[in-house]
Amino acid sequence: MRKMLLAAALSVTAMTAHADYQCSVTPRDDVIVSPQTVQVKGENGNLVITPDGNVMYNGKQYSLNAAQREQAKDYQAELRSTLPWIDEGAKSRVEKARIALDKIIVQEMGESSKMRSRLTKLDAQLKEQMNRIIETRSDGLTFHYKAIDQVRAEGQQLVNQAMGGILQDSINEMGAKAVLKS
């Protein structure tokens, strides 16, 4: 009975660990960061900012005063630092959840449990999904805002499938242990 509760707790914990962080901002633009420019491209046009604050909007170069140029420099610098921070934070949360669940599995079921490989596979799949939102490239990174909803849905499906497999593995492993004890 204790092991069944463990399996249920694992499922609930994994679902909770995967719970979506809700952001108050709804992105409507792709952001492409390269060493030469930061490009914000979407429904309202195409904005390109250089590290020194030069601005081009929909192909037209704009002359800025000193204050506007500083704002442009600050904006592109903020995007350059924030997007990698968001990417790392999201991947770190998934990794921490995997480590916590793996520790419980090892403690309760042993290091040879098949649940561990399912958990590792899920971790890799979720990180791969996240790479579709913030894609790291050799020359920078790209934030794909249109990928968010699709990745959320596919990620939830991956979690559901993995949890079903983990639950089945836990039942099989608990049954095998019970037979060996008899």
Each language-model region and where it sits:
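Gram-negative bacterial Sec-dependent N-terminal signal peptides
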Residues: 1-19
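Terminal leader/tail segments of proteins
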Residues: 18-182
